[in-house]
Regions:
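Phosphate-coordinating catalytic segments in nucleotide- and nucleic-acid-processing enzymes
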Residues: 4, 48-273, 277, 282, ...
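C-terminal lobe/lid and adjacent interdomain/linker elements of RecA-like ASCE P-loop ATPase modules
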Residues: 1, 303-394
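Short, solvent-exposed loop/turn segments at secondary-structure junctions
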Residues: 11-13, 26, 32-33, 162-165, ...
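Phosphate-binding P-loop
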Residues: 16-22, 253, 278-283, 310-312
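Walker B catalytic motif
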Residues: 289-292
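Walker A/P-loop NTP-binding motif
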Residues: 42-49, 278-280, 306-310
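Pre-Walker A-like glycine/lysine-rich segment at the N-terminus of P-loop NTPase domains
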Residues: 1-50, 54-65, 297
Length: 394
């Protein structure tokens, strides 16, 4: 199920905020205002999903204690108590949060962290992190892997530090089996090789210029929207247990030799995991992307936003952190062109409360004409106008 709302208390700079998520949710704002902290709150739960599921399993066992013999009851009691004492993990595949002092709000330091998630259809689950021992408690009584898309094996997070052009890349059978490409997209080459003939789950994501719904064909055609005529070629090298990428360009009737990622534009490889993540998605999946605009020309930024819009219109839930006005405007255009409905998207502007380290969050909505009718907060994509005013005044 999709996440409908998240309420967070006492996590880093997030003293008490509420975010209503839509199909597409854009997180933006000034630097160091709490945007990544919001994403980290979700990743913290994802990182500790096994502990959360154990808590749920314990709850189910406790509810049926009367049916078991005494020795088994004693064992269950011990298991439950041991789980209660187990601290959450602050380091792992999804998060690198440091230690206890780094995650609690400094202005109310001795209060527990609370993260409340509402799902669709409406179901409320509260997670509490104890200030004293970092133990986790939860109101869920069932394992969440099949209940909330955040805990699904198909959840994909791409942080801003993605793979760069290189001669070879890692293999990971574990990630490929789980339909994942890594938080940096580091297994993208391996994934593309193994799944090159796999049909798209969402037919609407098929590029208009390709005749097939093969993943690799569509990745190349969407990539060519960013660099005209490019084709990506993944390879797997069993002798070195590595994967590689190369690129070819087609112009007219001609095709170039294969080029290493080191010999084409940096942004081509940097955006590749984003395109793959969107094209491999299916309805109800959750995808979180940080700074998709990095190293892309404005046209490329707009194309990625349009691809996101098509995925959202077909049931994927996407959270994007971005500073790009081109990305925002492309989502507005997608709404005006009826790819997205107004209720499909929400924008949140993060800033800091004056004379405080506390995050302030303001919601903005896009109407059917692509307009943002609320007053734009100071700092919300207004720098173009600020600089233009200075030019005009000369």
């Amino acid at each position: 199920m999709k996440i409908e709302k998240v309420q967070i208390k006492n996590f880093k700079s997030l003293r008490d905020i509420e975010i209503v998520l839509r199909g597409f949710t854009l997180i933006t704002g000034v630097n160091s205002s709490g945007k990544s902290t919001f994403i980290q709150s979700l990743l913290l739960l994802k990182e500790n999903r096994e502990l959360i599921n154990q808590i749920a399993t314990n709850s189910m066992m406790m509810s049926s204690l009367g049916e078991h013999p005494e020795p088994l009851k004693t064992h269950i009691f011990k298991l439950v108590e041991d789980t209660k004492k187990q601290p959450i993990s602050l380091e792992g595949e999804y998060i690198h949060l440091g230690d206890k002092k780094d995650i609690f709000n400094q202005e109310v330091y001795e209060e527990d962290i609370s993260i409340l998630i509402n799902t669709l259809p409406l179901k409320e689950i509260n997670f509490t992190i104890n200030y004293n021992n970092l133990s986790l408690s939860s109101t869920t009584q069932i394992p969440l892997s099949n209940v909330i898309n955040l805990f699904s094996d198909d959840f994909q997070y791409l942080n801003t530090d993605r793979i760069q052009p290189d001669r070879t890349y890692e293999l990971s059978e574990k990630h490929i089996r789980k339909n994942l490409i890594g938080t940096k997209g580091e297994y993208t080459a391996h994934y593309l090789y193994e799944n090159r003939d796999r049909p798209l789950n969402i037919k609407a994501l098929k590029h208009e210029n390709t005749k097939t719904d093969r993943l690799l064909d569509n990745v190349s055609f969407w990539l060519s929207e960013i660099s005209n005529g490019v084709k990506v070629l993944p390879k797997k090298h069993l002798d070195t247990h590595q994967a590689s990428l190369s690129y070819q360009y087609t112009y007219g009737e001609n095709t170039t030799n294969e080029y290493s990622p080191l010999n084409v534009g940096f942004g081509i490889t940097y955006v590749l995991p984003i395109i793959v993540s969107i094209l491999k998605s299916k309805p109800d999946d959750l995808l979180i992307i940080e700074n998709p605009e990095s190293h892309l020309h404005p046209v490329g930024q707009s194309k990625i936003a349009k691809l996101c819009a098509i995925a959202v219109a077909n049931g994927v839930q996407i959270i994007v952190e971005s500073h790009s006005d081109h990305f925002l405007n492309a989502i507005r255009v997608a709404t005006k062109e009826d790819i997205l409905k107004p209720e499909d998207s929400a924008i949140y502007y993060f800033s800091k409360i004056a004379d405080s380290m506390e995050t302030k969050v303001e919601q903005l909505l896009i109407d059917a004409n692509g307009k943002i009718n609320q007053n734009w907060p100071k700092g919300f994509f207004d720098e173009y106008d600020n600089q233009l005013d200075k030019l005009i005044s000369w």
